[in-house]
Amino acid sequence: WSAEDTGLLKQVEERGSIQVGLEATYPPFNYQDENGELVGYEVDFAKALAGKLGVKAEFVPTKWDGMLAGLETKRFDIITNQVTITKERQEKYDFTQPYTVSGIQVITTKDKENDFKSPADLAGKVVGVGLGSNYEDWLKANVPDAEVATYDENANKLQDLRVGRIDAFLNDRLAVNYLLQQSDGKVVAAGDPFDKQRMGVALRKGNEDLLAALNKAIDDLR
């Protein structure tokens, strides 16, 4: 007999907590406030999901480029980190129904706002993306002539944009307002968002009991 023989939902219930992977550096979704407390939409969402399961949410801050690997090696039970549901990812992981719908937004400096009317305008430009993100995948697949610069942290992309190391970066449309509020008008969203994206809670395959419970919880929270 091993823990694997009992479903993950049962393990979570017996443990009294669900372990949640997130970056903790991705405002407004999940980040640390000035007191070092984890806050943000997905922090609240994960706590609400846990509440529906009758357990606590236990957060495991993890860099994005190690996030899916962390799920596989069981560092946590689920991920709530704006994980876009893609065909490739669905082959390896299960996802709940979407809890946010977003798109890709080009972020650039005020003086270059008119250079980026459509995604095709990214060709020949240095474009920042999160390492291992679907933005990186999208850029390489759709604008092969763009020069790709990869980043671990959003803050570094913003910094490099300001000093001119990159011409633009790609980000989640839903995160944009927060970013722009922090940037004193020098940084702008250029063009319309594109490539509609659905974000779900990611978990390891073979945990139908937990998947069903999470989907029901999302229904209940709507």
Residue ranges of predicted features:
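Extended ligand-binding regions for polar small-molecule ligands
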Residues: 1-3, 44-52, 131-133, 198-222
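Extracytoplasmic small-molecule ligand-binding "clamshell" domains
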Residues: 1-82
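Short helix-initiation/N-cap motifs at beta->coil->alpha
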Residues: 5-6, 43, 59-69, 114, ...
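Beta->alpha turn/N-cap motifs
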Residues: 22-26, 60-65, 74-86, 109, ...
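Flexible hinge/capping segments at coil-to-helix
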Residues: 109-127
